[in-house]
Swiss-Prot record:
Name of protein: Protein GVQW3
Origin: domain of life: Eukaryota
InterPro entries in alphabetical order: Mos1_HTH, Transposase-MT_Hybrid
Lineage: Eukaryota, Metazoa, Chordata, Craniata, Vertebrata
PANTHER family listed in its UniProt record: MARINER MOS1 TRANSPOSASE-LIKE PROTEIN, PROTEIN GVQW3
Gene for this chain: GVQW3
Length: 254
């Protein structure tokens, strides 16, 4: 219970002893506490209780889990839990810490300044310490499997997204340079892969993982051609072939 409400209940009890009516008591509280005054219904309810002989100004004991407050200890517990797993819901955190959901929600919102983010955004977010190491590992893979010129010429970023109901063997791919907005080039010359992709500039999210795994397979060849206004990129390994399709990039003149 808030301290200011406890103080107002004591004031109501004092007004009852002075034989003040419920309306007069509410008017006096409104003048004294302004916007923080208790509601009219609550003032009348407590006025009636004290008039009937009640002495205790605190709430009656309730069954169930006790209500907890936003103490420093609880705030630290919520912070540690949400940092260990950011996919937990408010309900799951409340059950884990044995707190009520409203307390957890207020701690997240007011004390930790956190808010819910769509899962579509979270899928591409890495921990603060991950991008550097992932970028370095991806660059090592590129250098170890291809000529040195590949790492020196790469200057873009790959991001991939899937249809809601993707067809087998077909994916939407978005090739875009992070610095200039250009579409990265993909081609194959005598079995050697060349792509404008760099682990240094990329944000190294989930699509980059997929790219590294994709190109780390055995010998494969990739060719591209334009048909019906779409860019088709074909990757084949022996008798197997995977088809990637992308809408043509529209250049905007500034």
């Amino acid at each position: 219970m808030s301290d200011r409400y406890l103080e107002q209940r004591i004031s109501i009890k004092f007004c009852v002893k002075l034989n003040k009516s419920a309306s007069e008591t509410h008017h006096l509280l409104k003048e004294a506490y302004g916007d923080e005054v208790m509601s009219r219904a609550r003032v009348f309810d407590w006025h009636k209780r004290f008039k009937e002989g009640r002495e205790d100004v605190r709430d009656d004991a309730r069954s169930g889990r006790p209500v907890t407050h936003r103490t420093d200890d609880n705030i630290q517990k919520v912070k540690d839990l949400v940092c260990s797993n950011r996919q937990l819901t408010v309900r799951m955190m409340a059950e884990e810490l044995n707190l009520d959901k409203e307390t957890v929600r207020l701690i997240l919102k007011e004390n930790l300044n956190m808010r819910k983010i769509s899962a579509k955004v979270i899928s591409g977010v890495l921990k603060e310490t991950e991008p550097h190491y992932v970028a370095q590992a991806g660059l090592e893979l590129l250098v170890s499997r291809d000529p040195p010129t590949l790492a020196s010429q790469s200057s873009g970023i790959i991001s991939m997204s899937h249809h809601a109901k993707p067809k087998p063997g077909v994916q939407w791919c978005k090739f875009q340079s992070e610095s200039t907005g250009r579409r990265a080039r993909s081609a194959d010359v005598q079995g050697q892969e060349k792509m404008d992709v760099t682990a240094q500039e990329a944000r190294t999210n989930l699509p980059f993982y997929l790219f590294v795994l994709f190109r780390s397979s055995m010998n494969w060849m990739m060719s591209m051609h334009i048909r019906e206004g779409c860019l088709f990129i074909t990757r084949s390994t022996n008798s197997n072939a995977n088809l990637f399709r992308k809408h043509p990039h529209r250049h905007t003149q500034k």
